Design a protein with these regions (language model features):
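Glycine-enriched, solvent-exposed interface loops adjoining structured elements
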Residues: 1-245
Length: 245
């Protein structure tokens, strides 16, 4: 759906649902509602409890097709810094647009001789296990206090400006590459160039990045949000909490 089609169909649906009683919306206002609708739909699709089908990303092949256009893969082989939470860890800067990590693994150089990092080494692939800080504390209370032989731990952190992952490997491992596949946050839907205002720090027109199969859902959701904003009553907002995705 083009930006013009989004705008035109928004007007039709909005006027129908409001019986032409509400004032018209300009392109900026429609862009705000469309972008909010897009973000809500993406988040609800990834949270099984947030949609009527009770299915997350891996629960339905259609979900993977729907979001294939904002799926990214990358590997990071440099720029590692020492861990701030765990002395064994290495901190990796990840892309700022990461919305949800799908899967990840690490490549490490492993010393073959236990306890001797200068011995002949081999390259090993480790499955990364994402953990939160509560889980980290629990694991550190155990006798071995380290990941299993073929695993590494990952903690997420943020210094206020950049998103970071702290990768914790075993005592004989040296991190060489971090591989990640993720869903990026879709860019804002901006129907036309903006003057005097911004949306997600952008002023130029931008199209919807999601698969066209989702465009009608985004449009319908945006109109519902606009209606609730105009009516402003509690019941409308409660109904919006009952996700239709």
């Amino acid at each position: 759906m083009t930006n013009q089609e989004f705008s035109n169909e928004f007007d039709v649906l909005y006027n129908n649902i409001m019986s032409n009683q509400a004032p018209g919306l300009d392109e900026y206002e429609k862009s705000v509602f469309l972008t909010k609708a897009q973000d809500e739909i993406v988040k609800n699709y990834f949270n099984p409890k947030g949609n009527k089908y009770q299915e997350g990303f891996d629960g339905n092949e259609k979900r993977q097709i729907d979001f294939s256009m904002i799926m990214r893969s990358t590997k990071i082989s440099s720029g590692f810094t020492d861990g701030v939470f765990d002395s064994r860890g290495k901190v990796v800067i990840i892309d700022s647009d990461v919305m949800m990590i799908l899967n990840e693994y690490a490549t490490v150089t492993r010393a073959k001789s236990e306890g001797d990092t200068n011995s002949t080494s081999e390259t090993v692939r480790l499955t990364i296990v994402p953990i939160n800080y509560t889980e980290y504390s629990r694991l550190m209370s155990k006798p071995y206090k380290r990941p299993l032989k073929w695993q590494a731990w990952r903690l997420l952190t943020n210094d206020g400006t950049t998103k970071k992952a702290e990768i914790i490997v075993g005592p004989n491992d040296t991190l060489t590459t971090y591989h990640i596949r993720y869903i990026k946050r879709p860019q804002a839907i901006i129907l036309s160039n903006l003057e005097g205002v911004t949306l997600d720090n952008k002023t130029t027109a931008q199209k919807c990045e999601l698969d066209p199969i989702l465009h009608q859902e985004i449009l319908q959701r945006a109109v519902e949000l606009a209606k609730a904003a105009y009516i402003g009553d509690l019941n409308s907002n409660i109904e919006l909490g009952k996700r239709s995705e």
